């Protein structure tokens, strides 16, 4: 259970290289105490990597709470229109990869890049520099110029869109939480959500626009509900 911070401490072994969490969990928008998990990670000299796709840079900035690396699927809220594929890796530059002693690919000579030691060349930025120098070259995971343009264009309206997403979600959540045919609604803004206290601490601008519901009557009623939707679409992606 990732919501119990002590479980991270107990799960760490000698070969553990990192801790990975989400700012808002999929699908029930669970929230983990980022600062507490960051403290555990750093005590064991491993980085905390956070997926902030659902949280978005507008609602929360994980690096300010102790995250070392933040990733996004930019296809979702950053792009905002479902038109382009892309991802983002943000390195805080705060983690000391050399002192960790767990990352020989950063501290030992790299034979495929002239024998350099990335930690000696780039210091705390060695992780992100190696991604650009080695992984980007070897895998070809370079975004197309037009997709990059669309994502940059999406960033211009991110705050306005997410603000409206959150406002709309809260209205729907409020309505559904009172509906007689709904068993439960899962969104951190609700007092009954198990992570409501963390929501108030980490998400002053709102806890995102993703929520789930439990329909009374089981799977058949849930299917009937989905088939009856007129405004919302049934999709495999966010």
Model-based region annotation:
Residues 1-179:
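Conserved PLP-enzyme active-site core in the AAT-like
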Residues 181-238:
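Conserved C-terminal alpha-helix-loop-beta "cap" of PLP-dependent enzymes
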């Amino acid at each position: 259970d990732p919501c119990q911070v002590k479980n991270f401490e107990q799960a760490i072994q000698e070969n553990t290289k990192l801790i990975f969490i989400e700012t808002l969990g999929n699908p029930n928008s669970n929230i983990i105490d980022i600062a507490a998990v960051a403290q555990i990670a750093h005590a064991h000299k491993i980085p905390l990597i956070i997926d902030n796709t659902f949280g978005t840079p507008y609602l929360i900035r994980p690096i300010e709470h102790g995250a070392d690396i933040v990733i996004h699927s930019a296809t979702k809220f950053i792009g905002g229109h479902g038109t382009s594929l892309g991802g983002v890796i943000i390195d805080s530059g705060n983690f000391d990869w050399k002192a960790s002693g767990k990352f020989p690919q950063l501290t030992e000579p790299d034979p495929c890049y002239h024998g350099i030691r990335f930690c000696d060349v780039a210091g705390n930025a060695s992780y992100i520099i190696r991604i650009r120098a080695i992984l980007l070259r070897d895998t070809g995971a370079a975004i197309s110029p037009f997709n990059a343009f669309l994502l940059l264009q999406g960033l211009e309206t991110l705050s306005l869109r997410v603000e409206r997403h959150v406002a709309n979600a809260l209205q729907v959540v409020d309505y559904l939480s009172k509906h007689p045919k709904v068993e439960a609604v899962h969104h951190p803004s609700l007092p009954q959500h198990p992570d409501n206290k963390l929501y108030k601490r980490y998400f002053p601008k709102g806890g995102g626009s993703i929520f789930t519901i439990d329909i009374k009557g089981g799977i058949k009623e849930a299917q009937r509900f989905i088939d009856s939707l007129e405004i919302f679409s049934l999709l495999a992606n966010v």
